[in-house]
């Protein structure tokens, strides 16, 4: 699997039928479509992500009434139901990669208010190790995460995710996948 950019990541998440928050990709002139999305997936907060470039502007917690104002200036962006709606339910967030040679890279946060970006800048766990390292047992729910990666054959892929204490997202599962990366 080769994923070279954010659009390919979205496509791969969809093709693999992985759990995600309701999300849609929009262009600058699609305000009517944005309103339809908001009506279809009512929530207190939405996340807006610039998809025109890696590391683009990201707003995690935008109130529904502010979304149309916030998207001004974006040329290509996604809107999704925000994890901020589930701050009381988030257990773990960050990114993890299990390589086929048994190496493991994990940058994770147990802060329930953290985003993936927060986890990367202020992690509770930051390991570059192998699958046999006993320190991995210190990561809450590590076995659950590993089983998810294995069940979905996500080896050799950086998986940005969050784990919740209840089912969330379009598949009502405990793990949400935000992004998959291999070559960017």
Give each language-model segment a name.
Residues 1-184:
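Nucleotide/phosphate-binding sheet-loop regions of phosphoryl- and nucleotidyl-transfer enzymes
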